């Protein structure tokens, strides 16, 4: 049985000079191929801001996989989905494939794009 580690670094973001917000992710998530992965991100700013999820593979630029909590950009497989509940947002990967092994980052931004 193959295990796919999904690395989830802690990410801290600032919104201008007014305030800083800390978003917390677990250090890692490992799942078997074909299983469902749920990656959470928590932070007090999340009820007031949208969550964005990026996937980054070694040696590559980050790729946006979810925006505005649950929207999926064109070209991103349907197995990627996002949800939000209070101070917690979740990236779900249904039927994890080997190519999904990557670092996943969450960040928050308001509707104007301010982080």
From Swiss-Prot:
UniProt subcellular location: Secreted; Cell membrane
The Ig-like domain, residue ranges: 20-115
PROSITE patterns: IG_LIKE
Annotated spans, Complementarity-determining-1: 42-50
SMART domains: IG (SM00409), IGv (SM00406)
One GO cellular component, as annotated: extracellular region
Keyword Signal listed: yes
Region annotation Framework-1: where it falls in the sequence: 20-41
Region annotated Complementarity-determining-2, chain positions: 68-70
Cystine connections: 41-106
Function noted in UniProt: V region of the variable domain of immunoglobulin light chains that participates in the antigen recognition. Immunoglobulins, also known as antibodies, are membrane-bound or secreted glycoproteins produced by B lymphocytes. In the recognition phase of humoral immunity, the membrane-bound immunoglobulins serve as receptors which, upon binding of a specific antigen, trigger the clonal expansion and differentiation of B lymphocytes into immunoglobulins-secreting plasma cells.
Protein name from the UniProt record: Immunoglobulin lambda variable 3-16
Organism: Homo sapiens
Taxonomy of the source species: Eukaryota, Metazoa, Chordata, Craniata, Vertebrata
Encoding gene, per UniProt annotation: IGLV3-16
